[in-house]
Amino acid sequence: MKTILQIEDNFANRRLVERVLEPFAYRLLHASDGQSGIDTALQESPDLILLDMGLPDMDGQTLVSILRETPALAKVPIVALTAWPESIAGEMAIRYGCDGCITKPINVAEFGRQIEAYLAR
């Protein structure tokens, strides 16, 4: 079973991702801030990290840098979940070190397929 860590401070967004991914039988973990996201990632070794780029304690760029500089986590795919405009979201996510980007509000019909594609890499 694949493990996904969602680092997201907004409860409604966490619940939405949980509901959308439920049929896929992933093990879904949650962290509500950057530091607990790092701690959870180190303890659980997720197969994918879904990262809100606007966390209250740490900006997304800083968090991605920390994850990438941590040997045990450096190769874990990171997908930004962001409210940035779609026209710049992908470019900004890649510039910050993410493997990809999904814009909010998420397209429920596409989200599961997108996650499966990132996990298949």
For each feature predicted by the language model, list its residue ranges.
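The feature encodes the CheY-like receiver
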Residues: 56, 74, 86
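C-terminal output helix
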Residues: 15, 106-115
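Two-component/phosphorelay signaling modules centered on CheY-like receiver
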Residues: 11-29, 96
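Conserved acidic carboxylate
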Residues: 8
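Active-site beta3 strand of CheY-like receiver
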Residues: 44-50, 55
